[in-house]
Regions:
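Cytosolic covalent-transfer regions centered on His/Cys nucleophiles
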Residues: 1-161
Length: 161
């Protein structure tokens, strides 16, 4: 059993979802999402965490096919594994380096520094869901923070812990 028990802690909540997100670039999008994590007490140091997210982003693009960006970092500033979600405003998109174009769904994944295997499992499990067009479209069309949080959390119910 890993430190993450999905029955006890939801990875995302409606408060961690931004609808109609508008950002100048991927760094600003990550900053908006990280601010939600900070406000909810899920990260302890906003600037320190963002430095790590941006450093990770410079190492390798985090764009997935189908218009998804998944900036992520393992960090000592993370209190609990969390996912903040941004759905861009209609007609707005951001470059996360995906070969097929810009992102309209951004999922910021934050895991504690010591949780290496958990970080990889969350990334892999979420990526499997995000590769399905119907899942991506459900997130984009929801227009409701509660529904989006539930979709993300339910996609990770079978997370092997």
């Amino acid at each position: 059993m890993s430190s993450l028990d999905l029955q006890d802690a939801e990875l995302t909540t409606p408060e961690l979802v931004i609808l109609d997100m508008v950002a100048e670039n991927k760094e600003e999008a990550a900053a908006q999402l990280a601010a939600r994590l900070f406000e909810s007490g899920r990260i302890s140091n906003l600037e320190g965490f963002l430095e790590q997210v941006n450093s990770r982003e410079h190492q390798m693009a985090t764009g997935l096919p189908g218009g998804v960006g998944i900036p992520h970092a393992r960090s000592e500033h993370v209190q609990q594994t969390s996912i903040a979600v941004g759905v861009t405003r209609y007609g707005h998109s951001l470059d996360f380096g995906a070969v097929d174009g810009r992102a309209t769904l951004i999922l910021l994944i934050a895991t504690p520094a010591q949780s290496f295997s958990e970080h990889l499992e969350v990334l892999a499990t979420l990526a499997r869901s995000l590769f399905k067009e119907n899942f991506r479209e459900s997130l984009r069309r929801a227009h409701d923070e509660e529904v989006i949080a539930e979709l993300i959390n339910s996609s990770l119910v079978f997370f092997d812990h």
